[in-house]
Every structure is written in C-alpha cells, then in structure tokens.
Amino acid sequence: MRWIANPLNSPKARVLEGALRDSRLKISASALPVLADLLVGRGIDEPEAAACFLSPGLGDLHDPLRMSGMKAALDRLEAALERKEKVLIYGDYDVDGTTAIVILKTAIELCGGAAEFHVPHRIREGYGMRDEVIERAAADGVRLIISVDTGIRAFAAAETARRTGVDLIVTDHHLPGPTGVPQALVVINPNQDGCDYPCKHLCGAGVAFKLAQGLMQRRLEAKDQSRLLMSFMKVVAIATIADAVPLLGENRVFAKLGLQGLRRPVNVGLKALLEVAKLGDGRALTATEVAFRIAPRLNAAGRMDVARDVVDLFDEKDMERARKIAGRLDQLNAERQEEERRIMDNIERRLEEEPALREAYCVVLDGEGWHRGVIGITASRVVERHGRPTLVISCEGDEAYGSGRSIPAFHLLHAIESCHELLSRYGGHAHAVGFALPSANVEKLRVHLDDYARARLTPADFEPQLEFDRELPLGEVTPELHQALVLLEPFGMENREPVFAARAVRLMAPPQAVKDKHVRLRVAPAVNGAVATAVQDFTPRCHPDAAAIPTHRKERDEWGTRQDGGASSSSSSSSSSSSWRDNVAFKAMGWGLKESCDRLQLLAGDRLDIAYSLGMNDHPEFGGLELTLRDLVRAR
C-alpha cells in the first residue's frame, strides 16, 4: 500500500492558528497547530469558515429561496394546501427516499395540509416514476405530485402528469441527463443548469428538507420553525450520512446537529429503531454508527420487502407497534446480510477462477436471480476488496437489473452513458449507478465498459493507497489534542477521520490476534531519535491528571460539543509534560491487519512506521486514548 502525504500549506495554517487562538472556541494551545493544519488541508482556511465548520448552527442553513424553482414550488404547494387538494409524494425505496417522504409529509401536515405517499416496490416497479402510478393517482383525484429523491430523468412521467391534468414538482439531487430536465411544472435540483445554490451535494432528503423549510417559513411562527427544524435535522442527518454525500457545508450542519439530537429522540419510531440497533442508551451517536447500524435496517425494507414500512415507522405513535415495525426491519436486515454473503461467495469463486474477469478494468458480474435488493451493496464490497469499478447484475429471464460502484478515478455515470443504447434505463452519480437492460446485452456491456475503462485508467489507479494528513509523533498525542479533534466530527465523505503517521515507534509486546483477522498492539513513541524503554500504559488511571480525561462517550460530548452545536470551552493549558508523553505506551487496534502482522513476523522491540487515527475507548474499566491503525510497516 502506498502512503501519500496530503500537502500542507503551512503559511495559511499558521494564520488560521492565530485566528483560532483568539476565537471564542477556546481550543487548547497545544492542539492548535495540528487542528489548523487539518482544517487548511480540507480547504477551510478562513477564520469565519473555520468557526462555522467547527461549531455549526441553524443560522448556517441557506435560504431555501436561493434554490432555482423554490418560489414557484412553494406557491403551488401553498395553493394546494389552501384549496385542500389531494397531494401525493412520490419517493424512492432507499433510506434517502423514504426519509425524504417522512420530512415533507410531516411538514405539510404541520402546516395544515395532508399528503399521501407512494414508495415503489424495488422488484415489481423498479427505480423511478411509473406512468401507471401517476395515472392511478390522477384517477383518484390527486392534483399535485411531488417527487423526492427521484424524477430528474422522468421525462415520460412528466408527460403523463401533464396529459392527466396533474401538476408535477420534481425534487431530486441526482445528476440531470444530457438532454436536460423533465418538462414538469417545477424542477428543484441544486445540480440543474442555472441553479446557483451554494451546496451542490445535498442528498434527496436534504432537497426535500429545503422545501419543507421554505414551507414552514411561510406558514409557521419563528419559534415553531426553529423547534421543528431541529426535529427534522435528526432524520435528514440519517439520510445525509447513509447516502454518503460530502459532509461539508450545509450537509455538515445536518449531520452535526442531527447526531446530537439523536441522543434523545422524541419520535416513537426513531426510539424503537435505536433500541433494536442497541443504540438507545442516551449517548451521543457517531456517523459510523448511523451508517452501519441505523441505515442498513432502514434500507433493508426497500431491499428485501416493502419500503413503506420506514414511513409507517416514523408515523407510528404507539411504542409497542413501533417496536414491532422496528423488529421487522431488524429481521429483514438479517435476511439481507445472509443474501449478500451468498452472492459474495459466488462472486469470489468466479473472480478466483476467471482471471480475465478479475483483471478487467471495469468488472461486470452477473448472476441468475441474484436478489436485486442487495446487488448495490455487493458491488460496494467488491470495490472495497478488489479496488476496481464494479457492476453487479441480476438476470431475471429476458430482463436484467444492475447496480454499480466505482473508485475515485472513474466517473461511472459517464461510463454507462457512453453505452446508453444497450440500456433500458439508467441514472446515478459519478461513483454509484443503477440501470436495467435486456439480458442479451450483458456481454456487450461487459466488453464496452472494459474498453472504455482501459482508455481512461492506468494500473496505478487500482493500487491501494492510504492518504495521511501529517506526521504526528506519538509523543505529541495528548488528551487535549483528542478533545480538539472531536470538533472535526462527524467524519464521512470529504471530511474523513484524520490519519497521522508516526515513525520508528516501538512495539512493546507481540501482537495479539483478535477474531482471526484483527490485532491488538501496544506501541511507544520514539524519543530524540531513540525509543523509550520504560513506559506505562496510557489510561486514565495512570495519567497525571486523570480527572481531566473522559472515559465515556457521554462525557466526551459534554467537553467536546454543546447540544446546540457550539464548542465547549476547554482549558488552553496542558498538564502533560513532555517527559510524561515520552514514557507512555498506547494501546492500538489494527482492524484487518493480522495478515500484515503475520507477514512481518513482528516481535517485541521491533520498530514500526504506523499510520493511525486517534480515538477514545469508552470502556469504564480500561478506557482511554487509543490508536486505530490504518497500516503498519517496518521502520526504514
């Protein structure tokens, strides 16, 4: 694996460091140089932008009217409410689509209206807006349809709506096609031509939230707006994290404030969901927990059965009924995991047996009857393991349905657009697509995409690489630094968890294997070109100022960020002496690194170069600062 150091802009970082030193954030002076380097490395080099990034609040949300089409959409929606017209919200079956329905439906109801909703069945209807659904809605008296997280390429659906006398408002975040946007009454999408909205990377629920925000600004008092916006923030945070959009700008406001609100949810369905995910203990949640424990259960409804269960869960007022729905989602998620394992086993065998398939620049895998609900997440797994753009296709008789995921260097939507004549329909983003095609075209698609990728990629694009932010010797790792790094949370797309490099650290004992794949180590810092020989574990009990080190996530939130998103004040003085730092051993966890350690045949006393992230172990008995290893090699 290649280690790549992100470039440092020291002059800008030092200017920002001075501004932060004088700010209201009260960050420890010893942590400021590292924090400033990290912010500038993320493109945040102005004091005002840094303050907003570290301490976002509701005031950092943009005016919804800055989005093209918003005023016209609000005018039409208000007219529907005044005339008590039937309104239908047309969503999608993933987390983003179902939560977008929840947000907009709730906002309409709070503003005195009512709305029905439709979530397509993944297998029977597939992705996108169907003509027959619109025709049926028109026959039932619906006069306004609002799409959420879908519709930006629904040209036929827009024509059907116009023919049946239904006004269609499209709200979406997916990229428009080369021929523009549908001829709907209004199209709201920050990515459409001519839209100057500052945050281009909203998820579908984020766009729906902006419509809901605009509606509440028109129809509710200011005090009610703030309270309800904070309530919606929890739901839009789940969608924003689950849809893996960049956690910058407005998305960061959603995620940061929403995660704080998830500590104490009011919504009965959300409480039941957190319970079944074993997260309902009142502690602060992380983006990782949302991505891997909440989102999969919500996604399981659309993957394995009927996604309207998600909307019903958030609508439910009775706790016992909510627990039953949440339990059903949990069971569906278990079924999804088993189906995913079955398909992955099949795929791994094929990749091992077919070198030409394994060595393709764009891997196209197909199987008869593979469950459509899990092919997307399976494609993600293949990309993670093999580092190549991957499409996974389920063949069902004469028709085939596919989902693709990509690597940073390859724009997958452009790739499938280049062979659109082979496809029945398609859509997506640079690194995630969905599509359908005749089964007879699968082999043609495989050949075309491999040729297309070979013309644009090199073998270096497939080589695993690890980007690290800067070198940070273990002797400079302190509780105050960790406290400052917490301000950068939540981590995700384009705001990944900081990764540091430390050279010539000493391995204090042989690695301990954990569940066959992982390892636990103890490492100590190098000291003045040498390595410490007498060290003590870094735990709260041995720290000279043990009371200052939090050992529970509950405490971490108290000293890290306030409930309103602002930073708490902390002492700018450090009680840790340099001599103490030089004589501390850190516990380190290497997830998936057992094979690397076995290959290196590590022994106590070996010197290593490590790439690591810094975290806090919450265990009440032996918690404290802990390193998460990203990679390790013998010191040069």
Indicate where each model-derived feature is located.
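Hydrophobic helix-and-loop "lid/oligomerization" segment in the mid-to-C-terminal part
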Residues: 5-143, 164-165, 217-444, 454, ...
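Intrinsic disorder/low-complexity segments
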Residues: 18-29, 526-582
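Conserved phosphate-handling catalytic cores of large alpha/beta enzymes
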Residues: 137-140, 147-245, 416
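A contiguous loop/helix-start segment that scaffolds small-molecule binding in enzyme catalytic cores
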Residues: 244, 264-267, 454-526, 580-599
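Noncatalytic, beta-rich nucleic-acid-contacting surfaces in large DNA/RNA-processing enzymes
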Residues: 399-403, 550, 625-629
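Short nucleic-acid-contacting surface segments enriched for D/E, G, S/T with interspersed K/R
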Residues: 595-611
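OB-fold/S1-family single-stranded nucleic acid-binding modules
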Residues: 620-636
